Amino acid sequence: MSTGQAPEKSNFSQRCSLLSRYLKEKGSFGNINMGLARKSDLELAGKFDLKGQQNVIKKVETSETRPFKLIQKFSIGEASTSTEDKAIYIDLSEPAKVAPESGNSQLTIFFGGKVMVFNEFPEDKAKEIMEVAKEANHVAVDSKNSQSHMNLDKSNVVIPDLNEPTSSGNNEDQETGQQHQVVERIARRASLHRFFAKRKDRAVARAPYQVNQHGSHLPPKPEMVAPSIKSGQSSQHIATPPKPKAHNHMPMEVDKKEGQSSKNLELKL
């Protein structure tokens, strides 16, 4: 009997030592209340709503179940099986993770400068709307790309020059064009020759009057002919103007001849 009780006492002492170390490191049991509640806490809990009371009860139940589980583990011997005394750190401050409830949620849509909000919108329909929006976006991008390609094609169009002869034209059209050019040149030359011939006839008709006009030269003025008088010279040495030449008397002789010819015509008549 003495041999069977010794290992049980050693296990119990190890557990007690582990608990003492845990308390020294943490300073308290954390959220473990060991089923003990203060009067002030109960009074505050009574002031809350029904929902708040339910939450407090749930927390108390969880806090009661956790220390009992720890005590069971220590009693069974699951805390430490090795010879070395190693403390097990359990963080009891973290609340239990609650899985999100799958249900309807709020949906906001920004479209055309407007904001639309839908409450309690199912997830399936939201996914369908997202797929439709993606397809519409692809269609809009394709249409923009096609328009840009069309604009580039229009800008690259080469306008043919109608003045230049095209390579696809017939040789007959080119020959006829050359013939028309030759005919136009000949017509221009002929019109120029006619114009010059008329000018010659007019010059011949006006020739005698022009000769008489050019033949009569007026005598030069004395101011232009007289040289400048130098200082110390007398007025006697002033040069006399030159005498007019014989051809200056030609207009008088021509007038006399015309008068005689007019008299002869009168006598004949």
From Swiss-Prot:
GO terms for biological process: defense response; response to jasmonic acid; response to wounding. A motif (Nuclear localization signal) lies at residues 187-194. It is found in: Nucleus; Cell membrane. A motif (Jas) lies at residues 186-210. Belongs to the TIFY/JAZ family. Homo- and heterodimer. Interacts with MYC2, AFPH2/NINJA, TIFY10A/JAZ1, TIFY10B/JAZ2, TIFY11A/JAZ5, TIFY5A/JAZ8, TIFY9/JAZ10 and TIFY3B/JAZ12. (Microbial infection) Interacts with the pathogenic Pseudomonas syringae HopZ1a protein. The jas domain (186-210) is required for interaction with COI1 and Pseudomonas syringae HopZ1a. Repressor of jasmonate responses. This is Protein TIFY 11B.
